[in-house]
Amino acid sequence: MTDDKNNKETTLEKEKVGVYICYCGGNISDHVDVETVRKKIKRIPGVVVARTNMFICSDSGQEMIIEDLNNGSIDRIVVASCSPSLHEMTFRGAVSRANMNPYLYEHVNIREQVSWVHHGEAATDKATRLVAAAVAKAKLLKPLEPIQVKALQHATVIGGGVAGLRAAIDLSDRGFEVMLIEKSPFLGGQVAHLDQIAPFSEKAADLISSLSRLVLQDTSIKIHTRSVVEKFEGYIGNFKLGVKTYPQSVEDQEKLERFDVSDNKRGEFIPFVGVCPGPESSDTEAFTVETGAIILATGFKSYTPRPGEYGYAEFEEVVTLPELIRVLAENETNGNLLKVNGREIRSVALIHCAGSRQIPGIHPEDESGNLNEYCSRTCCSATLQTANIIRKAYPGTRVFEFYRDIRTYGRGQEALYEQASRNKVVFLRFEAENLPKITRNGSSNDFPLRVKVRDVLTFGEEIEVPADLVVLATGMEPNNISELVEMMKLPVGADRFLLEVHPKLRPVELSLAGILLAGTCQAPMDIGEACNAASSAAVKVATLLARGQVELDPFIAEVDLDKCTGTGACVEACLYEGALNLVAIGADGQTVHR
């Protein structure tokens, strides 16, 4: 602590509280009369400053607080704004820059707890009472120092796809020991099932092989495939994971035997050389990992259409885009017509948004009642690239694209759309309320399927397209990591992807310090975005652990046994496994759990 800070804190006076109330751009002020709250709070004894600001978290808002602290007007502050999970660190930093102890600041959530759930006078009244309570607490605040604990110079990456590999490499480059845990037998994740990557048609094999090679050759990276995390405890800098590695199954062995390195034939698991980490144990092994930080790179799974959705599982001629991509990769020769399973394909219908941008009442729910209302972001580019490949390699095969919107964002992506138009791909646009309908063609000598659609581009005219093959551009879904979510108490969004603290200010951090996100476990994204997120997470880990110690908040929770009713709600809500436990005690001649 600096001398200036010591001098300020040894002369702390009571009743010099500054209160700062945020409009939050209308998020708060649309329902809370912020000026009324300010006027009422200003009348509380001890409040010497009461100000409002459109965005307290902005640089100008923080400077306002720092200026009041520096000129001695106040010695404690109360900020009434959005959730402290978003901006508590922001305001602690502002207080520290004014050479004041950051724990002389109290935060009030009047957005999520007030304006988003109350309206009118009720909202204003509740906000006033919450801020008044915070003022009373602020008067009792004392300067505190964070707890310093040793941080292990080790990181664990869970997930061996593109994001996990990138994170492991970046961590190793920064001098950390890394453990990479992957549940499948091989590295590479979903990208290992691709052939060419949009928009520049790089080979997926080249990308995965280069990343895998760096990981496999790095002695500071320990790889465990067929492994899952089964136990978790600890805190930032000192986590402990229980990991179990499963033996190679007979089914896996059969899939391995179908992979011939000499002629590079594709197997079900290994689409190319360079993603197998080496010999696997034939026994189940359990071990413990002590690690300083964890990066979650658990990836995504491709959407599986519901039976009957666009004719899927009803007509054998209806396949998914990943399935077609594998067929195209395995076709060794070009020709006038594309061939699939020995059949000549004269006409292909590509249907966008299968499993994405779903609408309640229109699209079918899964067995858990879920809908994917989000855009998967990569499907349009992948579909357009596939259309271009077909038109170039098989000029006799006609390609029709059925879409709601074409979303080719990012560098080079729009060129795919322009190229498809030049390649004479036919585009038919439908509305969500009128999805394309797939029917069997009655004539055995004609095309097997017909796709019927009301085309927006021709003012709703009903058009029928004959098709030998219908391809569904399936989107992304979060992998099933419910056990990890429950074990680590990870926050999950409405879309079932893991939820970051703040999409702009803390985009790769979770509410539990020391656990970070990388790649598509967080949201649909392309390979470049996944690698960027992985590198960001690696840099954040390096920043947290580089000094060899981490700072913990100097707050110690105590259980008031006289008030405890033994419900266990606190144990369930606590983010830190093992920090709280119900124990049997004697009370009034009986044994109770508290």
Where are these regions (language model features)?
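Residues forming the flavin
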Residues: M1-R594
